[in-house]
Amino acid sequence: MSEIEEKFNESSYGADSIKVLKGLEAVRKRPGMYIGDVGDGSGLHHMIYEVVDNAIDESLAGYCDLVRVTLNKNGSVTVSDNGRGIPVEIHGEEGISAAEVIMTQLHAGGKFDQNAYKVAGGLHGVGVSVVNALSEWLELRIWRNNKEYLMRFNNGITEAPLAVVKENIDKKGTEVTFFPSVETFTNIEFDFGTIEHRLRELAFLNSGVKILLVDNRFEEVKEVEFYYTGGIEAYVKYIDRAKHAIHPCIVVNTENAESGISLELAMHWNDSYHENILCFTNNIRQRDGGTHLSAFKSAITRVITSYLDTTGLNKKAKNYFSGEDTREGLCCVLSVKVPDPKFSSQTKDKLVSSEVRPVVENAVYTKVLEWFEEHPAEAKAIIAKIMEAANAREAARKARELTRRKSALEVSNLPGKLADCHAKDPAISELFIVEGDSAGGTAKQGRDSKIQAILPLRGKILNVERARFDKMLGSDQIGTLITALGISVEREFSLEKLRYHKVIIMTDADVDGSHIRTLLLTFFYRHMPELINKGYLYIAQPPLYKVKKGAAEFYLKNEQALQDYLIKSTINDATLILDDKERLVGDNLEELINKVVKFNGLLDHASKKFNRSITEILAINDLLNNKIFEPESDLRLKKALDVLNSLEDSPDKTNWEVLKHENKIEFFRFSRGLKESKILLKEQLESFEFVQISKFALTIFDIFSKQLKLIVKSQEFDILTPSQLLNTIIECGKRGINIQRFKGLGEMNSDQLWETTLDPTKRTLLQVRVAEIDEAEGIFSTLMGDVVEPRRLFIQANALNVVNLDV
């Protein structure tokens, strides 16, 4: 019997454990008060988190070690666990099953009974009833008492009482499947990445609990497992995986018997210049901190002060250090478990429980100071970093004072390169940051000078990820940008003086432009995060192509838009004839072309691993599977190769031939005496990419097994493969038009730039948002930091996803 089964005690968690505080109608009337924003996706995802938090609460109580979240094809979500199962007995006060009480009445649940749960999360403490109230339908399955129970709800209303559907079941747990209400939520499509981040967070915070996330919505099934035995120490290492830690992790794990408050903490200093502290209460993240964060900061400052006084190292300090100096480069995960936590709002973004502060401050001070005393060499390295931070802060202060004195003597302290706008209202003013004087000149001519300002940046932009604050202030480009914006950075940061409420990065669509954009994004993320949080930072989307047909001119954003245009311009004049009989035109032909486009995308992706032409010809002949090894398929394989050879006819190359082996097939030919060989392994045929291609090919198999002839404006083409059909359609679309590809903004004249990128009524802007702070932290550190290995691994992992590489 497992430890979890041994702990199982139904008598301690029964119907009488459920305390009731009634009322659900308010949830449907004002859902935002209970579940979060119903328009931006946060409330939608909180529906999942609420159910998952119930399962995690079971694990905190010691009864659950497996949680599974499944995104279903029909748009619903299933959350299951192997906990005790929701109580099913008739509730004494309500006269209905405890399960129905929990699902239909607000503020009902075991969390209100201290004997059932000592500590609990639960998104807003309102129970899964909120999820039920805001779901079009919900299905509840419970495994308890060796039985399986089932109950269904529509818009929070019970369809029928809880019923036993199976008996003699050796299983315990709860499963909730729900479909969000389209009347409540603006968008009901769940984002895999958002859910993945939260579940990974929970797995780190609850060491030993396995959490599975499965996405069944698409042909490509995604499955991710989160299981960490290292707890929050492993979490700190994960967050800081792209940085150099200057010492091993400091771990604190303690509980205050009197208050029942427990503390878990893992922290280390790294060689970066930014602090990163994540705070949790009962597994819920407090993005705005609170009493636990204040206590931690105070304790760390006290530790450093005390250690300096004790060791005499303070005599070597050139400058007094501040609390911020002690936290430069500090990465910490702080998790407290509190029996009855209090928060500043229902979204629980800030902890206000005053009793938490002394517990955390005393524990952190005692344990961390003890660690310093036991590890003098590591402590010395930490102190050296803090002193260096204090010196840099002092140098930055002097640099700011010098800048202010210079500004006070100038008639106008706006940079000379800035072509400012006439408007003084920041709400309607826009600043375009462009690379180089050439693009800057064109932008100045094409802009609306009433509301649009242009700031050209010339020369190399500093990578602030690798630079101290004082060095950053000395950078000409960064200094120019700060002055133009009208605000300072770091400790003096205030959006009140921001001169533009749209700050738009406008760079070329090549590698250099991408690099400059990344450097600017790094600066804003590190030193002006509020600009991003308020939604003031944007990225311009200049077009990649200009298309001219007769007197008409228009612009296309990217390769995909160009392809779509060329297909649509041809499709109305095209007819596909099948076996000299059936004809595909109009919508039917367009439907086929859309399938071919998707098929081509699958082939492009798989071409990184095997020859594209061979893959395609095998797929449309139903041979991209184990059938290819069967003798009965030899004739079909020969015909397929004949088609391939007719398409790739070249005087320098011989025809493709094939050799079958037990577990592989070799395709080979000779080019000027040299053998070119492609090996297809049997195991490759079972890979996800090939299975996906093979299945999709069956949807167009009937058409491409026939003799095809494409007619476009009386011109005829014999068609043998999907790629040939698509390429012919595209080439026909190019006739009579002129296509110009822009490599840089400087290639556009001022009218073109206005029409495509500057005109507020026509342009496309991407608003910069940070969905998950610690994920963004990891990405910036990986791509822009000093550590090479994580960057190399990142590039290796994503190299095959590159579609267009500008070299």
UniProtKB/Swiss-Prot annotation:
<dbReference type="GO" id="GO:0003918">
    <property type="term" value="F:DNA topoisomerase type II (double strand cut, ATP-hydrolyzing) activity"/>
</dbReference>
<dbReference type="GO" id="GO:0003677">
    <property type="term" value="F:DNA binding"/>
</dbReference>
<protein>
    <recommendedName>
        <fullName>DNA gyrase subunit B</fullName>
        <ecNumber>5.6.2.2</ecNumber>
    </recommendedName>
</protein>
<dbReference type="InterPro" id="IPR006171">
    <property type="entry name" value="TOPRIM_dom"/>
</dbReference>
<keyword id="KW-0963">Cytoplasm</keyword>
<dbReference type="Pfam" id="PF00204">
    <property type="entry name" value="DNA_gyraseB"/>
</dbReference>
<dbReference type="InterPro" id="IPR014721">
    <property type="entry name" value="Ribsml_uS5_D2-typ_fold_subgr"/>
</dbReference>
<comment type="function">
    <text>A type II topoisomerase that negatively supercoils closed circular double-stranded (ds) DNA in an ATP-dependent manner to modulate DNA topology and maintain chromosomes in an underwound state. Negative supercoiling favors strand separation, and DNA replication, transcription, recombination and repair, all of which involve strand separation. Also able to catalyze the interconversion of other topological isomers of dsDNA rings, including catenanes and knotted rings. Type II topoisomerases break and join 2 DNA strands simultaneously in an ATP-dependent manner.</text>
</comment>
<dbReference type="InterPro" id="IPR034160">
    <property type="entry name" value="TOPRIM_GyrB"/>
</dbReference>
<dbReference type="InterPro" id="IPR018522">
    <property type="entry name" value="TopoIIA_CS"/>
</dbReference>
<dbReference type="InterPro" id="IPR013760">
    <property type="entry name" value="Topo_IIA-like_dom_sf"/>
</dbReference>
<dbReference type="GO" id="GO:0046872">
    <property type="term" value="F:metal ion binding"/>
</dbReference>
<dbReference type="GO" id="GO:0005524">
    <property type="term" value="F:ATP binding"/>
</dbReference>
<dbReference type="GO" id="GO:0006265">
    <property type="term" value="P:DNA topological change"/>
</dbReference>
<feature type="binding site">
    <location>
        <position position="510"/>
    </location>
    <ligand>
        <name>Mg(2+) 2</name>
    </ligand>
</feature>
<keyword id="KW-0238">DNA-binding</keyword>
<keyword id="KW-0799">Topoisomerase</keyword>
<keyword id="KW-0547">Nucleotide-binding</keyword>
<feature type="domain" description="Toprim">
    <location>
        <begin position="429"/>
        <end position="543"/>
    </location>
</feature>
<keyword id="KW-0413">Isomerase</keyword>
<dbReference type="Pfam" id="PF02518">
    <property type="entry name" value="HATPase_c"/>
</dbReference>
<feature type="site" description="Interaction with DNA">
    <location>
        <position position="460"/>
    </location>
</feature>
<dbReference type="InterPro" id="IPR011557">
    <property type="entry name" value="GyrB"/>
</dbReference>
<dbReference type="InterPro" id="IPR000565">
    <property type="entry name" value="Topo_IIA_B"/>
</dbReference>
<dbReference type="InterPro" id="IPR013759">
    <property type="entry name" value="Topo_IIA_B_C"/>
</dbReference>
<dbReference type="Pfam" id="PF21249">
    <property type="entry name" value="GyrB_hook"/>
</dbReference>
<dbReference type="Pfam" id="PF00986">
    <property type="entry name" value="DNA_gyraseB_C"/>
</dbReference>
<dbReference type="InterPro" id="IPR001241">
    <property type="entry name" value="Topo_IIA"/>
</dbReference>
<dbReference type="InterPro" id="IPR036890">
    <property type="entry name" value="HATPase_C_sf"/>
</dbReference>
<comment type="similarity">
    <text>Belongs to the type II topoisomerase GyrB family.</text>
</comment>
<keyword id="KW-0460">Magnesium</keyword>
<feature type="site" description="Interaction with DNA">
    <location>
        <position position="463"/>
    </location>
</feature>
<dbReference type="InterPro" id="IPR013506">
    <property type="entry name" value="Topo_IIA_bsu_dom2"/>
</dbReference>
<dbReference type="Pfam" id="PF01751">
    <property type="entry name" value="Toprim"/>
</dbReference>
<keyword id="KW-0067">ATP-binding</keyword>
<feature type="binding site">
    <location>
        <position position="435"/>
    </location>
    <ligand>
        <name>Mg(2+) 1</name>
    </ligand>
</feature>
<dbReference type="InterPro" id="IPR002288">
    <property type="entry name" value="DNA_gyrase_B_C"/>
</dbReference>
<comment type="subunit">
    <text>Heterotetramer, composed of two GyrA and two GyrB chains. In the heterotetramer, GyrA contains the active site tyrosine that forms a transient covalent intermediate with DNA, while GyrB binds cofactors and catalyzes ATP hydrolysis.</text>
</comment>
<dbReference type="GO" id="GO:0005694">
    <property type="term" value="C:chromosome"/>
</dbReference>
<dbReference type="GO" id="GO:0005737">
    <property type="term" value="C:cytoplasm"/>
</dbReference>
<feature type="binding site">
    <location>
        <position position="508"/>
    </location>
    <ligand>
        <name>Mg(2+) 2</name>
    </ligand>
</feature>
<dbReference type="InterPro" id="IPR049353">
    <property type="entry name" value="GyrB_hook"/>
</dbReference>
